[in-house]
């Protein structure tokens, strides 16, 4: 009984353990089959160690491992590799390649691959448009030079038609015919239309004299530009050139803003000693550049900005037109001209025939002094007749030679011309030598002290200093002096031309010329003369007025809503 029970329990345990083993075996077989089947038909995982070797080579691993790419991927990689190598020769394939080497199955252009980025294509395109590479040096090998089209027919041989037919070339005439023929597509010195040079620009009529091409900068323009043009032209003396009184130590005013230690005195408080002062020309106005009214007002009576600013200039000196070269001779090589500052002083000099443009007048011994020596005997006795060598003048200096104005001591004309400040840069050190004297200029370079016959034409509205009474006259109304006239081609034209803007009538001409220009209509308004560049303090008080339509043409310029608004206002005023 016991044995039977024991055997039965043992058999049950055997069945139980055997079933567990069978279950474990079944689970293991299922897992193994899953692992086996999972390896079929797919590539290996990216994190396997040897995957990098298989990637890019196009070849799978050893036959022991079933992890090589499918046929589709392998064929694509071979095709892409071949296509990439072929793309390196653009003149054979013409393929525009992306900027990355194709390796995996992916869209041709992605965020990492953009179009037209092949360097060979860029080089080929640059050569095509620039033509900057020779045939033998072309990087892409595709550049071809641009060639001008040849003539369709050759030159007709010389001959004559007779009753017997056409006779050939006469002996000896072939070379002459070739020399007279220009086998070209272009004509020399032939323009399609005739050039007509008019005016300085828009809004100015053709009756205004113009020289030197279109929009050239060395011509006189109307006052409606601003009075700066009047005071910057060649042929003007520096205002204040004959002002006397005061000592050098006291007159160093310059500008209170930029030189706070300067002693500033009114004209009435300056000592009465007369200081030698010659004719100060525009070409010598260098040194301290005048600064306009900026900030604090200097403590000087009637100060109006740059009009009273002091600028360092030469003392009793006048440098000649030899482009900064000193004159030859013993002792002081810079002759003192008109040392006492008298209006009719002696000792000035002229240049012979400076208005001529011939080489004879540009070179050689042309300078000489004139008139007897002055009272002080500074100039040599018996007048100065020593010739001087004048270097060849530049084109710009020749342009200035057509103006005839002279310093206060000039007794004959023409005198040596002055320079335009813009054409004489500060780097000319000889022009800046000996600038140890301060003087008080006016608003610009209009000479208020020399008579009009010596070139002082234009506006004269600055106070002058009376050296005898030691007083400053009060400013008067603006006075137009007569325009300088003469038979010379003063402004470079072929006819007698007065100063275009030297009188009110000429200014009215400019006003009429600009009348049809609706944008420049208010430019020539005479009220603007009260706020010109010579009176910067008045410019501070200038109140611009709004443009008001006062005729039908002006109304047409306005939009429809503005016209209705103005009409409503007009009707409202009429009802009142």
UniProtKB/Swiss-Prot annotation:
Q: Name one Pfam family in it.
A: DUF5899
What does the induction field say?
A: Expressed in the early-late phase of the viral replicative cycle.
Cell location:
Virion
| UniProt region (Disordered), positions on chain | 322-348
Q: Which residues cross the membrane?
A: none
The annotated region (Hydrophobic) lies at 13-35
From which domain of life does this come? Viruses
A GO cellular component annotation here is: viral capsid
Per its UniProt record, what InterPro entries does this chain match?
Answer: P2_DUF5899
For this UniProt record, the keywords arranged alphabetically read as follows: Capsid protein, Late protein, Virion
Record note on domains: The hydrophobic region might anchor the protein in the underlying inner membrane.
Function comment: One of the minor capsid proteins that constitute a network internal to the major capsid proteins and outside the lipid membrane. The minor capsid proteins glue and stabilize the capsomers. Also acts as a molecular tape measure protein that determines the size of the viral capsid.
* Assembly, per entry: Interacts with the major capsid protein.
Q: What is this protein called?
A: Minor capsid protein P2
GN (gene name): A342L
